[in-house]
From Swiss-Prot:
InterPro entries named among the record's database cross-references: Acetolactate_synth_lsu, AHAS_TPP, DHS-like_NAD/FAD-binding_dom, THDP-binding, Thiamin_PyroP_enz_cen_dom, Thiamin_PyroP_enz_TPP-bd_dom, TPP-bd_CS, TPP_enz
GO molecular function: acetolactate synthase activity; flavin adenine dinucleotide binding; magnesium ion binding; thiamine pyrophosphate binding
Required cofactor(s): Mg(2+); thiamine diphosphate
Name recorded for this polypeptide: Acetolactate synthase large subunit
Other facts: Contains 1 molecule of FAD per monomer. The role of this cofactor is not clear considering that the reaction does not involve redox chemistry.
Binding-site list for FAD: 175, 281-302, 324-343
Gene expressing this chain: ilvB
Catalytic activity field: 2 pyruvate + H(+) = (2S)-2-acetolactate + CO2
Length: 626
């Protein structure tokens, strides 16, 4: 369990408490609210409805639990995720039965793939109506079983405190994840003698946080023998609040670090050992580090297909140390030499401690580090200007990052804007980057930003969103306006489903089937008018010289949400890129430009063109440095 998570009770801490008061007679609905209060759930996101209405009466009276009324249950789920990602605490959402519950399925699945601690409480039709196809009946337990860490149906009102305490414990411990608690309406209305703390019993659930000493010793031995090691860092390091331990271990050993999309910020991007983000749209230096490594030290990462590319050709010469809190992840994709089950924070601390105590000689890896630094310098982040006066989206995001800085929280949905944000925002601190990494959910950014602001009200929160994603959940801007969450939206508006269009350009001969979202030259919808109608201040930007003043103006407004509609060129693309299913060794820095790794043959048709292009890049870098 991480430090932030320890602020919320677990069965161990709950069971150790004495009873503070005699049993109190109350309804199941009131027991739900009282349990949330005891579990320190300070905010919940939801929408009332018939099957959950009993809960909303005692919730109205609660002085400890704030309810945020969203405009769609998907917004409630993503807001709970945003809250959880920023705070490290359990995010809570509430919905009624049937369509209310099914509207939570997408954010639950999203939280499951990104290992987010969430508890979803759903109302259900009365027990006597179950299985009769009653009005607004849906088997939400069956529907969500594949995408939850666990789920419950409470059939006895006396079990409500236990079920909720167990749900919170399951959500936050071990590998975090979503837990659903489904409660029929008659159980909410029935009475019980409320007793806290409840008796808790989770047979077979014993997550391991402390790594085995022998595995740590084996890992340290491999690390000492490696000539080209790399720390492959995933989101589990952020979940464990292990950023300080990671930095200490990397600096002591001098091992270069790559951070996945879900781990951005856990290791400062400005650090000389940081080689960037690996994966389909990662940096050449990060991809090269993995491909040419002789030892991968994978901490809290799951070898996602977007990182590995073609698994058979991924890191072909590397031995693997894989440390993860979830034993099911170890060896799932790649065979490993040293499996380590444990919390990332404890694993890194033990690795450092054992490394310092080791008397064995270690290899000099300075040449390896210099090689990767050379790749990083030769292939820096960059972009092409758009034709005419059209804005380059990368310029917008780069300007935003420079102006707002690394203390803010940045959220993104999925698509080109997500990748540009990952590339052009400078992440220096953990829990400052929220995105839908595993499920790739359009519409994630706005409600997640709302939840992030709820969890960190003193932080500046920016949602970097695309116009396609924005049209799915922009109604939550009204929630933000009414509830007092002054988030900022940087809307990257290219009038298209940008990532789909990019693939159609590259792989479908430019046949743009159903990707254009508006007619050329029209503002449809007019996001300025729309946003103002939703309770926001709205600004439209069409020229480069307007970008910075608009961002500065947005930062001055803190009494309502602000939307900046950046009109950008539709032909901007995300580079570098590894085509789906291809080897990471075939990464393209730009279209047709495949870098060399260690002098290997290029996959390009004409190596001479590659050399010329690389020379031009080198000259440009030298000119910039001069």
């Amino acid at each position: 369990m991480n430090v932030a998570a320890s602020q919320q009770p677990t069965p161990a801490t709950v069971a150790s408490r004495g009873r503070s008061a005699a049993p109190e007679r109350m309804t199941g609905a009131k027991a739900i609210v009282r349990s949330l209060e005891e579990l320190n759930a300070d905010i919940v996101f939801g929408i009332p409805g018939g099957a959950v209405l009993p809960v909303y009466d005692p919730l109205y009276s609660s002085t400890k639990v704030r309810h945020v009324l969203v405009r769609h249950e998907q917004g409630a789920g993503h807001a709970a995720t945003g809250y959880a990602q920023v705070t490290g605490r359990v995010g809570v959402c509430i919905a009624t039965s049937g369509p209310g519950a099914t509207n939570l399925v997408t954010p639950i699945a999203d939280a499951n793939l990104d290992s987010v601690p969430m508890v979803a409480i759903t109302g259900q039709v009365g027990s006597g109506l179950l299985g009769t196809d009653a009005f607004q009946e849906a088997d939400i337990r069956g529907i969500t079983m594949p995408v939850t860490k666990h789920n419950f149906m409470v059939t006895n009102p006396n079990d409500i405190p236990q079920a909720l305490a167990e749900a919170f414990h399951l959500a936050i411990t071990g590998r975090p994840g979503p837990v659903l608690v489904d409660i029929p309406k008659d159980v909410q209305n029935a009475e019980l003698d409320f007793v806290w703390p409840p008796k808790i019993d989770l047979p077979g659930y014993r997550p391991v946080s402390t790594p085995h000493a022998r595995q740590i010793e084996q890992a340290v031995k491999l690390i000492g023998e490696a000539k080209k090691p790399v720390l492959y860092v995933g989101g589990g390091v952020i979940k464990a609040d292990a950023h300080e331990e990671l930095r200490a271990f990397a600096e002591y050993t001098g091992i270069p670090v790559v951070t996945t999309l879900m781990a951005l910020g856990t290791f400062p991007e400005s650090h000389e050992l940081h080689m960037g983000m690996p994966g389909m749209h990662g940096t050449v230096s990060a991809v090269g580090a993995l491909q040419r490594s002789d030892l991968l030290i994978a901490i809290g990462s799951r070898f996602d297909d977007r990182v590995t590319g073609d698994v058979d050709t991924f890191a072909p010469d590397a031995k693997i140390i894989h440390a993860d809190i979830d034993p099911a992840e170890i060896g799932k994709i790649k065979q490993v030499e040293v499996p380590i089950v444990g919390d990332a924070r404890e694993v890194l601390a033990r690795l450092l401690e054992t490394t310092k105590a080791s008397k064995a000689e270690t290899e000099d890896i300075s040449e390896w580090v210099d090689y990767l630094k050379g790749l990083k310098a030769r292939f820096p982040r960059g972009y092409d200007e758009q034709p005419g006066d059209l804005l380059a989206p990368q310029f917008v995001i780069e300007t935003l990052s420079k102006e707002v800085g690394p203390d803010a929280i940045y959220c993104a949905g999925v698509g080109q804007h997500q990748m540009w944000a990952a590339q052009f925002v400078d992440f220096e601190k953990p829990r400052t980057w929220l995105n839908s990494g595993g499920l790739g959910t359009m519409g994630y950014a706005v409600p997640a930003a709302l939840g992030a602001k709820a969890g960190a009200p003193d932080k500046e929160v920016w949602a970097i969103d695309g116009d396609g994603c924005f049209q799915m959940t922009n109604q939550e801007l009204t929630t933000a306006a009414v509830e007092g969450f002054p988030i900022k939206i940087a809307l990257i508006n290219n009038g298209n489903l940008g990532m789909v269009r990019q693939w159609q350009t590259l792989f479908y001969e430019g046949r743009y089937s159903n990707t254009k979202l508006r007619n050329q030259g029209e503002y449809m919808p007019d996001f300025v008018t729309l946003s103002e109608g939703l309770g926001c201040v709205a600004i439209r930007v069409t020229k480069a010289e307007e970008v910075l003043p608009a961002i500065q103006k947005a930062r001055e407004i803190n009494d309502r949400p602000v939307v900046i509609d950046f009109i950008v060129g539709e032909d901007a693309q995300v580079w570098p890129m590894v085509s789906a299913g291809s080897s990471n060794s075939d990464i393209q820095y730009a279209l047709g430009l495949r870098p060399f790794f260690d002098g290997d043959e290029s996959a390009a048709e004409d190596p001479a063109d590659i050399h010329e292009a690389v020379s031009d890049i080198d000259a440009a870098v030298e000119s910039t440095e001069a």
